[in-house]
Structures are given as C-alpha cells and as structure tokens.
Amino acid sequence: MSRIKSAFERLNGEGRKALIPFITAGDPDAALTLPLMHTLVEAGADVIELGVPFSDPMADGPTIQRASERALARGMTLRKVLQLVVEFRKTDGKTPVVLMGYANPVEAMGLEKFAAAAAQAGVDGVLIVDYPPEEAAAFGAAMKAQGMDPIFLLAPTSSAERIAHVAEIASGYVYYVSLAGVTGSGALNVEAVAERLPLIREKTGLPVGVGFGIRDAATAARIAGIADAVVVGSRIIEEIEKSTAETACANVKALVADIRRGVDEVKK
C-alpha cells in the first residue's frame, strides 16, 4: 500500500481529515528546506506537497512565484529537489511527499528517468500542473509503473467529462482548486465548494483535497467539514517570506499547528 493511501486510511479510521501543507523546495534556501519539511510534520502535516521551482509558474500567484524565483536564484534544480527527499527519508519513512510542479523540468530530465529517480528518492506522488489530464496517459503510466500516485487538479470550471477522466487515471487523491484563478487569489466561497464536491465524488472514490484560498484555522475547519483534505500553500510561503532564517521554522510551526487545530475541529 502506498504511503498516501495508508495515510488517508489511518485518518479515516481516526475520524480525522488530512492536512497537506505546501512549500517550495529551495525557498528561502536549500539549507532550510529540510528543517521546514520536518517542521511541517511536527506541526501536524499528513502529506507534504513540495514545490519544484520553475521560471514560469503560470498557475501560481505572486507569493509562490516569488518563492520559485528565490529558489531558482539560489540554484535549486529538480535533481536537488530529489536529493532533499532522499535526505528527508533518512529520518522520516512515513510521511508522504508529493512533488508539485510543471512539465518542463520533468521533460528535460525525461519522463521515465524522472519517474525512476523520484521513486528511488522516496517520492510518493507527483502533480504536474500543466499536464492536461486528457494528454497525461504516459505521465500516469510512468508514475504508476514506479509505484507513485499521479495526482491531478480539478477546478470549478472542470467539465463532467474531465472529472470522469481524472477519476480513471488518478490515484492517491484528487486536488480540487477552489478558485478559478492562480494560487493565493480571491476569496474562498465554501458554499460553492460544497456544491461542487458531490459531483466529483460521484465519479471517484479517491479522497478529495481542497486548496487555494485557505489562510487560517477557521477556513480550514470549514473546508475540513466538506473535504477529505485541506491544502495550504500561499499562506505558509508568506510566513517564510517575512521570517528570517532563524525564525522561519518556529513561525511556520505555529501557523501550521493552528491550522491543524482548525482541521481537527471536524470529525467524520
């Protein structure tokens, strides 16, 4: 059983929802990424989404774009991201790690080579933002051949056909983008998300995570009431951005622990 599936089954048995925080690898620098990953776990993360920095992150708002720019300026690469996962796995063999990024770095390495290297490093799932599900058969097959979960985005604008297609090829969990925009944008309409999730659950038995626009414990609690997982990214990156190297881990831990408390207000 994959680490992702195991995590969701454990949480389901405990009557709890998953918390999935996102950070960008190499932001603010490579030396702090590993401590931040362990900090996320200490604060209550069930799965870590680790962003692979890219020069043109079209789905990301200004906050995560700046994180990518900082990481790239300090020399972060896809190979170095994988090495960070190797280091993480030396002391954490339980927490699932999902790489989230764009197609270009993966294709530059070669899909099969990337899949093998990621699996060997200890990656559990991969989400490529700019792979349309309809064109992702090779990606999905390559991930599954290496025992990893191909994870896909669904949005408020996703058609019934796209939802059905994602249900066929995805594993691990489905990531529902609660806003039709870039990360960190707009106000989250929880009622609109609640109306949309049953349409997704009609098509798939996979857990559904919801992200984009979740900034505090209260909103996390509301999303946890309707979704299987709460994904938080931009708010954590903001905390890193305004912290020093000395205070980043403590500040992120306090933020994520507070959001964890919000998520845990909800019982299945």
UniProtKB/Swiss-Prot annotation:
Subunit structure: Tetramer of two alpha and two beta chains.
Top EC class for this record: lyase
PROSITE patterns reported in the protein's UniProt record: TRP_SYNTHASE_ALPHA
Database matches in SUPFAM superfamilies: Ribulose-phoshate binding barrel (SSF51366)
Matches recorded under Gene3D superfamilies: Aldolase class I
Record GO terms (molecular function): tryptophan synthase activity
Cellular component per GO, a single term: cytosol
Annotated gene: trpA
Record bears the keyword NADP: no
Catalytic reaction list: (1S,2R)-1-C-(indol-3-yl)glycerol 3-phosphate + L-serine = D-glyceraldehyde 3-phosphate + L-tryptophan + H2O
Family statement: Belongs to the TrpA family.
NCBIfam families the record matches: trpA
The protein's annotated pathway: Amino-acid biosynthesis; L-tryptophan biosynthesis; L-tryptophan from chorismate: step 5/5
Pfam families noted in UniProt: Trp_syntA
Protein name per UniProt: Tryptophan synthase alpha chain
Entry EC no(s): 4.2.1.20
